[in-house]
């Protein structure tokens, strides 16, 4: 990573500097990772260009989570210093939610220099559809109808698919026809989770259906009863607002998500089903809640959709355009 990052930063800095002599840039838009890629825009900035640093993922928190690093370790301290240096070089810092805005502000970036543009689903793919009441297998009169819990996304430990499998084992007696459908690119972690499902005797209740294009996920979401975001608690998931929540809500499906700052900034218990991050028992309880009370699940999904509408990409796009326009004026 270090070699690739360094090579790309130097090459991009050279290209931008060379082109600046021919035609000056008004704006250089830098998207992390790494944060220090902002270095490539320094020469254009010297001759008048504005530099935006788009911080989608705070690197210290992400590296701590991926590599299980202590926050006081030398590696994390270096990454924090590089982040602070990079934030200072930008004219405008963009980030994805209020939690990251607070984080960067606490690390010395002036709050007035930070803009929030949320990660919103593409409305051309995840178009808004009003929530509709659904019936569980016990209430529909069809004993063959599965109660479908859906997970889609990266199959890595921090996203907690193992918690969903453990929760499924707990709810099987209450929901005999429960089925967990999993979508995402196969990883060694997934193999561990599927092996655990066998050990728990629920392998027939867990279906891994492979990776899907975004367009192909929509009918799968339509076919589920509830979407689950079973994140483990860690430095990164604490500040993350998963786009998957909005993807479920766009289709009118209730979602179960961890009670973390990055999510609580936007949702409450009236618009999402919450569990304590890492708590299998509470996650299982929330799955049963959705199954047992379809009327409440419908109402919660309806209220959650209001937040989806408020932060749909058409709204967020206008926020981005206003921030850029204000910077260039």
Go through the PLM ranges and name each one.
Residues 282, 289, 296-310:
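A short, well-ordered alpha-helix in the C-terminal region of glycosyltransferases
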Residues 191-216:
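Nucleotide-activated donor-binding/catalytic signature segment of Leloir-type glycosyltransferases, i.e.
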């Amino acid at each position: 990573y270090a070699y690739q990052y360094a090579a790309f930063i130097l090459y991009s800095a050279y290209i931008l500097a060379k082109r600046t002599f021919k035609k000056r840039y008004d704006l250089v838009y830098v998207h992390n990772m790494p944060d220090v890629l902002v270095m490539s825009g320094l020469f254009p900035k010297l001759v008048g260009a504005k530099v935006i640093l788009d911080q989608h993922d705070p690197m210290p928190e992400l590296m701590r989570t991926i590599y299980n690093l202590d926050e006081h370790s030398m590696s994390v301290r270096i990454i924090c210093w590089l982040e602070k240096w990079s934030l200072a070089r930008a004219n405008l810092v963009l980030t994805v939610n209020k939690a990251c805005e607070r984080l960067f502000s606490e690390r010395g970036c002036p709050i007035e220099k930070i803009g929030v543009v949320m990660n919103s689903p593409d409305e051309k793919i995840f178009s808004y559809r009003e929530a509709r009441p659904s019936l569980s297998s016990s209430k529909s009169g069809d004993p063959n109808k599965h109660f479908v819990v859906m997970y889609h996304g990266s199959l890595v430990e921090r996203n907690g698919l193992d918690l969903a499998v453990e929760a499924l084992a707990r709810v099987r007696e209450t929901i005999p026809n429960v089925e967990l459908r999993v979508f995402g690119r196969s990883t060694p972690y997934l193999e561990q989770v599927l092996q655990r499902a066998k050990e728990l005797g629920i392998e027939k209740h867990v279906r891994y259906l492979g990776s899907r294009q975004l367009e192909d996920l929509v009918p799968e979401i339509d076919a589920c009863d509830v979407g689950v975001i079973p994140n483990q608690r860690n430095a990164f998931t604490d500040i993350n607002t998963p786009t998957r929540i909005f993807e479920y809500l766009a289709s009118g499906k209730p979602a179960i998500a961890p009670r973390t700052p990055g999510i609580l900034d936007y949702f409450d218990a009236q618009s999402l089903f919450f569990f304590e991050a890492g708590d299998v028992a509470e996650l299982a309880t929330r799955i049963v809640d959705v199954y047992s009370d379809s009327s409440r699940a419908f109402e919660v999904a309806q209220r959650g959709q209001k937040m989806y509408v408020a932060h749909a990409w058409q709204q967020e796009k206008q926020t981005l355009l206003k921030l850029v326009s204000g910077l260039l004026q």
